[in-house]
């Protein structure tokens, strides 16, 4: 009851929500036949404050919230070493994409100039940072993100993943919030592996090549995808969630092995004459050749012209040098060395990898041609026995890794606390 009479006959007012009397709270605010106390108001404010960030994240990005290209590149620099040209291209493309969405929301449908979407194609060797760039962008912009492997996709009706499964995974990653999903980022890896197998498309049925490209084309250019609610399987009588993919940013990536030969052959044909500057194939690195890429090269490689046209922004990533790999080991916010130092620190042990050890790790990754992706397995292999035995050992203060540990698989040097004190 909002009000009651006390023993002395005075009218005592009560909070309609928590039931406390006017004597138990600081303030009681009256409304039409209801009362609310200051404590309930504070509780309501806390609830609203907790929900606002989630609403804002799902809502429209304001211009002030959107970092400019130079800020995007600076943030990418903290996680991705090198690849400056690719980072600049990506920063501009992502900024323009979300600026376009803001423009569409502000101007409405009556705007004369319609801004088209610019999806992105990343070309670079294995372990050069393609996936990490896309992941970092999505995390930075606080938008839903999903990675899809193009090699697992098949045409509808065949065994394998349907292309619409990509959108279903995107929805799952944002708790089935349709508005958020429609502004997300999709990264399709190994796009080069679904290239057309022959110049004549009518030779055989290519269920994991050109057919998948055609299916992806619809998603990339914008379509209404039908997705079962909460991850259910499709069946005829089911209600589907309709997702418009028009404003989803698609980033496709691949190593495109052999594309450099296609580009080199074209450039050799065009570079004939007295004024042509000729460089031998041995003098040109793969990254140098990739920088001369034209859409016709991708078509010759086996990507259908329609899909090439829907990926107008092309960013090429170079092969990582030994110095770049050493930087990747030590410099980024989540650098591999920092991660292992933290793991050893949990056992009260300091981990030191000497410069010679870092160089040996980088050289091994270069020999394996695995790029930055192969660094973890090399470090893991070198430290496996130590990590197995260390928790049961007493008195170890420091583990030191040098080039012998990496090259010859010898045990790292263990420094005990007594030795550390004596040397100090």
From Swiss-Prot:
The keyword DNA damage does not apply. The gene is clpX. Keywords: ATP-binding, Chaperone, Metal-binding, Nucleotide-binding, Zinc. ATP binds at residues 125-132. ATP-dependent specificity component of the Clp protease. It directs the protease to specific substrates. Can perform chaperone functions in the absence of ClpP. Gene3D superfamilies: 1.10.8.60, ClpX chaperone, C4-type zinc finger domain (6.20.220.10), P-loop containing nucleotide triphosphate hydrolases (3.40.50.300). CDD domains: RecA-like_ClpX. Residues 3-56 form the ClpX-type ZB domain. PROSITE patterns: CLPX_ZB. Belongs to the ClpX chaperone family. Component of the ClpX-ClpP complex. Forms a hexameric ring that, in the presence of ATP, binds to fourteen ClpP subunits assembled into a disk-like structure with a central cavity, resembling the structure of eukaryotic proteasomes. GO terms for biological process: cell division; proteolysis involved in protein catabolic process. One of its GO terms (cellular component) is HslUV protease complex. It comes from the Bacteria. One of its GO terms (molecular function) is protein dimerization activity. This is ATP-dependent Clp protease ATP-binding subunit ClpX. Zn(2+) binds at residues 15, 18, 37, 40. The lineage of its organism: Bacteria, Pseudomonadati, Pseudomonadota, Betaproteobacteria, Burkholderiales. SUPFAM superfamilies: Glucocorticoid receptor-like (DNA-binding domain), P-loop containing nucleoside triphosphate hydrolases.
